[in-house]
């Protein structure tokens, strides 16, 4: 089944000076959930991540996420499996009222140094709806069959 959605939310962005020649975030395939984000490190100063190190990598853009949505910053599976490169605090959340440059916390969990070069696809960004709840303090919660069973309580 093919669905044509002409009512997609609009993601407005501002290109910063450090993002001057970078491609806009984009979906690599028609069915992709996430847009690729690229590294806005200087071309003559690639960033070297040694095993165990982490770095805050600029994207070169400010995003105006539509109200009622968030941008989730997630690792790219290829970087993770091939090189051990992942995003910390994943998924990272960009709130709709944030107006600073989006940066990605990358960590090298691999065994070898990894070089991040200008324009390299470093993460993916998923735009997702947000639900804000009303908070109510109570003295107890309703009972369930599971109860307070936590980690591993439903089986392996």
Curated annotation (Swiss-Prot):
Pfam families: dUTPase. The keyword Cell membrane does not apply. One of its GO terms (biological process) is dUMP biosynthetic process. GO terms for molecular function: dUTP diphosphatase activity; magnesium ion binding. SUPFAM superfamilies: dUTPase-like (SSF51283). It comes from the Bacteria. It catalyses: dUTP + H2O = dUMP + diphosphate + H(+). Its cofactor is Mg(2+). Substrate binds at residues 76-78, 89, 93-95, 103. Pathway: Pyrimidine metabolism; dUMP biosynthesis; dUMP from dCTP (dUTP route): step 2/2. Its EC number is 3.6.1.23. Keywords: Hydrolase, Magnesium, Metal-binding, Nucleotide metabolism. HAMAP family: dUTPase_bact. Belongs to the dUTPase family. This enzyme is involved in nucleotide metabolism: it produces dUMP, the immediate precursor of thymidine nucleotides and it decreases the intracellular concentration of dUTP so that uracil cannot be incorporated into DNA. This is Deoxyuridine 5'-triphosphate nucleotidohydrolase. It comes from Agrobacterium fabrum (strain C58 / ATCC 33970) (Agrobacterium tumefaciens (strain C58)).
């Amino acid at each position: 089944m093919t669905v044509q959605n002409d009512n997609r939310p609009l993601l407005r962005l501002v290109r910063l000076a450090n993002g001057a020649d970078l491609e806009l975030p984009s979906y690599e395939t028609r069915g992709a959930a996430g847009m690729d984000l690229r590294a806005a490190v200087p071309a003559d100063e690639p960033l070297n991540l040694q095993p165990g190190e982490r770095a805050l990598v600029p994207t070169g853009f400010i995003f105006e996420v539509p109200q009622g949505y968030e941008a989730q910053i997630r690792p790219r599976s290829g970087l993770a499996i091939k090189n051990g490169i992942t995003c910390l605090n994943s998924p990272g959340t960009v709130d709709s009222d944030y107006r600073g440059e989006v940066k990605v916390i990358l960590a090298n969990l691999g065994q070898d140094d990894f070089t991040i070069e200008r324009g390299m696809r470093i993460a993916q960004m998923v735009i997702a709806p947000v639900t804000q709840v009303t908070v109510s303090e109570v003295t107890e919660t309703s009972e369930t069959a599971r109860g307070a069973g936590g980690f591993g309580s439903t089986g392996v």
